[in-house]
Protein backbone atom coordinates (compact mmCIF):
# COMPACT_ATOMS: atom_id res chain seq x y z
CA UNK A 1 0.00 0.00 0.00
CA UNK A 2 1.38 3.41 -0.98
CA UNK A 3 2.12 5.67 1.96
CA UNK A 4 1.10 9.29 2.32
CA UNK A 5 4.00 11.72 2.02
CA UNK A 6 4.71 15.28 3.11
CA UNK A 7 4.42 17.63 0.10
CA UNK A 8 7.13 20.12 -0.78
CA UNK A 9 6.20 23.80 -0.64
CA UNK A 10 6.19 26.09 -3.66
CA UNK A 11 8.01 28.82 -1.75
CA UNK A 12 10.68 29.23 0.94
CA UNK A 13 9.59 29.28 4.56
CA UNK A 14 10.41 32.99 4.90
CA UNK A 15 8.62 33.96 1.68
CA UNK A 16 5.40 35.00 3.43
CA UNK A 17 7.05 37.44 5.83
CA UNK A 18 6.14 39.78 7.41
CA UNK A 19 2.61 38.34 7.35
CA UNK A 20 3.52 34.80 8.46
CA UNK A 21 7.01 34.23 9.80
CA UNK A 22 9.49 31.78 8.38
CA UNK A 23 9.85 30.18 11.80
CA UNK A 24 6.14 29.44 11.96
CA UNK A 25 6.06 28.02 8.43
CA UNK A 26 9.07 25.78 9.02
CA UNK A 27 7.73 24.36 12.29
CA UNK A 28 4.23 24.13 10.85
CA UNK A 29 5.41 22.16 7.81
CA UNK A 30 8.22 19.98 9.17
CA UNK A 31 6.69 19.23 12.58
CA UNK A 32 2.91 19.63 12.62
CA UNK A 33 2.05 18.65 9.04
CA UNK A 34 4.66 15.90 9.13
CA UNK A 35 3.04 14.53 12.29
CA UNK A 36 -0.32 14.26 10.51
CA UNK A 37 1.30 12.38 7.64
CA UNK A 38 2.91 9.95 10.08
CA UNK A 39 -0.41 9.63 11.91
CA UNK A 40 -2.21 8.67 8.70
CA UNK A 41 0.32 5.99 7.84
CA UNK A 42 0.39 4.65 11.40
CA UNK A 43 -3.41 4.47 11.53
CA UNK A 44 -3.54 2.57 8.23
CA UNK A 45 -0.96 0.06 9.45
CA UNK A 46 -2.88 -0.48 12.69
CA UNK A 47 -6.12 -0.84 10.75
CA UNK A 48 -4.58 -3.64 8.71
CA UNK A 49 -3.52 -5.39 11.90
CA UNK A 50 -6.94 -4.95 13.50
CA UNK A 51 -8.77 -6.22 10.42
CA UNK A 52 -6.54 -9.28 10.28
CA UNK A 53 -7.53 -10.05 13.88
CA UNK A 54 -11.21 -9.11 13.43
CA UNK A 55 -10.68 -6.70 16.34
CA UNK A 56 -13.65 -4.40 15.77
CA UNK A 57 -12.96 -2.10 18.71
CA UNK A 58 -9.44 -1.47 17.40
CA UNK A 59 -10.84 -0.97 13.90
CA UNK A 60 -13.26 1.72 15.10
CA UNK A 61 -10.53 3.44 17.15
CA UNK A 62 -8.10 3.57 14.26
CA UNK A 63 -10.79 4.67 11.81
CA UNK A 64 -11.29 7.69 14.07
CA UNK A 65 -7.54 8.27 14.21
CA UNK A 66 -7.36 7.95 10.44
CA UNK A 67 -10.12 10.53 9.94
CA UNK A 68 -8.36 13.01 12.22
CA UNK A 69 -4.87 12.61 10.77
CA UNK A 70 -6.01 12.37 7.16
CA UNK A 71 -8.09 15.49 7.73
CA UNK A 72 -4.98 17.24 9.03
CA UNK A 73 -2.96 16.11 6.02
CA UNK A 74 -5.62 17.20 3.52
CA UNK A 75 -6.23 20.55 5.21
CA UNK A 76 -2.56 21.43 5.37
CA UNK A 77 -1.95 20.30 1.79
CA UNK A 78 -4.64 22.78 0.71
CA UNK A 79 -3.30 25.43 3.10
CA UNK A 80 0.16 25.58 1.55
CA UNK A 81 -1.30 25.92 -1.95
CA UNK A 82 -3.77 28.59 -0.76
CA UNK A 83 -0.83 30.81 0.21
CA UNK A 84 1.62 32.73 -1.97
CA UNK A 85 4.21 35.48 -1.48
CA UNK A 86 2.55 37.10 -4.52
CA UNK A 87 -0.93 36.75 -3.04
CA UNK A 88 -3.41 39.21 -1.68
CA UNK A 89 -5.69 41.58 -3.60
CA UNK A 90 -9.02 40.07 -4.72
CA UNK A 91 -10.28 37.15 -6.81
CA UNK A 92 -11.23 37.61 -10.45
CA UNK A 93 -13.32 35.82 -13.04
CA UNK A 94 -16.12 33.43 -12.21
CA UNK A 95 -15.12 33.12 -8.57
CA UNK A 96 -15.33 36.88 -8.08
CA UNK A 97 -18.74 36.97 -9.72
CA UNK A 98 -20.03 34.09 -7.59
CA UNK A 99 -18.71 35.71 -4.40
CA UNK A 100 -20.48 38.96 -5.25
CA UNK A 101 -23.75 37.16 -6.04
CA UNK A 102 -23.60 34.95 -2.95
CA UNK A 103 -22.32 37.33 -0.29
CA UNK A 104 -23.17 40.75 -1.76
CA UNK A 105 -19.58 41.87 -2.30
CA UNK A 106 -16.03 40.74 -1.71
CA UNK A 107 -15.82 42.92 1.39
CA UNK A 108 -18.92 41.26 2.85
CA UNK A 109 -17.49 37.83 2.08
CA UNK A 110 -14.19 38.75 3.68
CA UNK A 111 -15.98 39.99 6.79
CA UNK A 112 -18.07 36.80 7.04
CA UNK A 113 -15.07 34.52 6.50
CA UNK A 114 -12.99 36.47 9.03
CA UNK A 115 -15.81 36.28 11.58
CA UNK A 116 -15.93 32.51 11.14
CA UNK A 117 -12.19 32.33 11.75
CA UNK A 118 -12.08 34.68 14.73
CA UNK A 119 -15.19 33.17 16.30
CA UNK A 120 -14.00 29.58 16.19
CA UNK A 121 -13.93 28.05 19.67
CA UNK A 122 -10.94 25.81 20.20
CA UNK A 123 -8.99 24.47 17.23
CA UNK A 124 -10.08 24.27 13.62
CA UNK A 125 -10.31 26.09 10.31
CA UNK A 126 -12.47 28.66 8.56
CA UNK A 127 -13.39 27.44 5.09
CA UNK A 128 -14.85 28.75 1.86
CA UNK A 129 -16.34 25.74 0.12
CA UNK A 130 -18.46 24.87 -2.88
CA UNK A 131 -21.59 22.84 -2.16
CA UNK A 132 -21.95 20.42 -5.06
CA UNK A 133 -25.58 19.60 -4.19
CA UNK A 134 -26.84 23.17 -3.92
CA UNK A 135 -24.30 24.55 -6.43
CA UNK A 136 -23.38 27.43 -4.15
CA UNK A 137 -20.54 28.91 -2.13
CA UNK A 138 -20.59 28.51 1.65
CA UNK A 139 -18.40 29.65 4.51
CA UNK A 140 -18.22 27.53 7.63
CA UNK A 141 -16.12 26.50 10.60
CA UNK A 142 -14.30 23.17 10.42
CA UNK A 143 -13.79 21.78 13.93
CA UNK A 144 -10.44 20.15 14.71
CA UNK A 145 -9.45 18.57 11.38
CA UNK A 146 -12.61 16.84 10.22
CA UNK A 147 -15.83 17.80 12.01
CA UNK A 148 -18.86 20.00 11.21
CA UNK A 149 -18.75 19.56 7.43
CA UNK A 150 -21.35 17.77 5.33
CA UNK A 151 -20.33 15.47 2.51
CA UNK A 152 -20.32 16.96 -0.96
CA UNK A 153 -18.58 20.24 -0.11
CA UNK A 154 -15.34 20.99 -1.95
CA UNK A 155 -12.90 23.19 0.02
CA UNK A 156 -11.60 26.18 -1.92
CA UNK A 157 -9.95 28.43 0.68
CA UNK A 158 -8.96 27.61 4.25
CA UNK A 159 -7.29 29.46 7.11
CA UNK A 160 -5.65 27.43 9.86
CA UNK A 161 -6.89 28.56 13.27
CA UNK A 162 -4.94 26.07 15.33
CA UNK A 163 -2.60 27.98 17.65
CA UNK A 164 0.49 26.45 16.07
CA UNK A 165 -0.34 28.43 12.91
CA UNK A 166 0.00 31.85 14.53
CA UNK A 167 0.87 31.90 18.24
CA UNK A 168 4.65 32.36 17.91
CA UNK A 169 4.04 35.58 15.99
CA UNK A 170 0.61 36.89 16.96
CA UNK A 171 0.22 35.40 20.47
CA UNK A 172 -3.48 35.40 21.40
CA UNK A 173 -4.49 38.18 18.96
CA UNK A 174 -6.16 35.99 16.36
CA UNK A 175 -7.76 38.94 14.59
CA UNK A 176 -4.34 40.34 13.60
CA UNK A 177 -3.33 36.96 12.20
CA UNK A 178 -6.54 36.67 10.17
CA UNK A 179 -6.07 40.20 8.86
CA UNK A 180 -2.49 39.36 7.81
CA UNK A 181 -3.67 36.15 6.13
CA UNK A 182 -5.52 38.12 3.45
CA UNK A 183 -2.21 39.56 2.24
CA UNK A 184 -0.93 36.15 1.17
CA UNK A 185 -4.07 34.44 -0.18
CA UNK A 186 -3.27 32.76 -3.49
CA UNK A 187 -6.40 33.65 -5.42
CA UNK A 188 -5.13 31.90 -8.55
CA UNK A 189 -5.15 28.63 -6.61
CA UNK A 190 -8.59 29.32 -5.14
CA UNK A 191 -9.93 30.16 -8.60
CA UNK A 192 -8.48 26.92 -9.98
CA UNK A 193 -10.20 24.93 -7.23
CA UNK A 194 -13.45 26.79 -7.92
CA UNK A 195 -13.30 26.00 -11.63
CA UNK A 196 -12.66 22.32 -10.91
CA UNK A 197 -15.46 22.17 -8.35
CA UNK A 198 -17.98 23.76 -10.71
CA UNK A 199 -17.00 21.82 -13.83
CA UNK A 200 -15.63 18.42 -12.79
CA UNK A 201 -17.71 17.23 -9.83
CA UNK A 202 -21.04 16.61 -11.57
CA UNK A 203 -21.96 12.97 -11.07
CA UNK A 204 -19.21 12.21 -8.56
CA UNK A 205 -21.61 12.42 -5.61
CA UNK A 206 -24.89 13.75 -7.01
CA UNK A 207 -26.47 13.44 -10.45
Curated annotation (Swiss-Prot):
Cofactor note: Binds 1 Mn(2+) ion per subunit.
Co-factor(s): Mn(2+)
Annotated binding of Mn(2+), by residue: 28, 76, 160, 164
InterPro entries cross-referenced by the UniProt entry: Fe/Mn_Superoxide_Dismutase, Mn/Fe_SOD, Mn/Fe_SOD_BS, Mn/Fe_SOD_C, Mn/Fe_SOD_N, Mn/Fe_SOD_N_sf, SOD_C_sf
UniProt keyword annotation of 4Fe-4S present: no
Record EC number: 1.15.1.1
Endpoints of the signal sequence: none
Molecular function terms from GO: metal ion binding; superoxide dismutase activity
Manganese keyword on record: yes
Catalytic activity from the UniProt record: 2 superoxide + 2 H(+) = H2O2 + O2
Alphabetically ordered keywords of this record: Manganese, Metal-binding, Oxidoreductase
Family: Belongs to the iron/manganese superoxide dismutase family.
Protein task: Destroys superoxide anion radicals which are normally produced within the cells and which are toxic to biological systems.
Protein name: Superoxide dismutase [Mn]
Gene name, Swiss-Prot/TrEMBL: sodA
